Amino acid sequence: PDTKLIQYLAKHKHMSPFGHCFASFHVKAPVFVARQLVKHKFLRWNEISRRYVDSEPEFYVPDVWRGRSEDKKQGSSGKITVSSDLARNMAESAKKDYEYLLDLGICPEQARMVLPQSMMTEWYWSGSLDAFSDMCLLRCSSDTQAETQEVANQISMKMHELSLIHI
């Protein structure tokens, strides 16, 4: 392939040729991050379902809590000092409730209703480099939620590392 031409096209945002190249990623992130990312068009999504997988639920607890942005409806700013014990205790309680329901014979598709947005989920995400480029341009920006931005940055770095496309 003509590497110079490919880099030129990417640099100048001539993305249509990248609609013919595909990539797939295995992603693990909290449910609340997954729900933001699933909205991107033209990317195939296959999430691992608790209906079929009996693994023990894992939960995301942030190291740093952020304050609410004063100048936007969404977003965050600054750091708030608060213990993560509440989130850890809630996750542990939800896990116990989930296991209790399963022990009662409740089907997994109903028992999972007690699991919180902080539960980790995994999915396989495939699409064209053009579609991933569009997702990264939107989700790597500084006004994106930090946890979502982290996933987008990791995908962007992996694409760069593989010299697929430089976003």
Q: Where are the regions that the model predicts?
A:
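Family-specific signature for flavin-dependent thymidylate synthase
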Residues: P1-I165
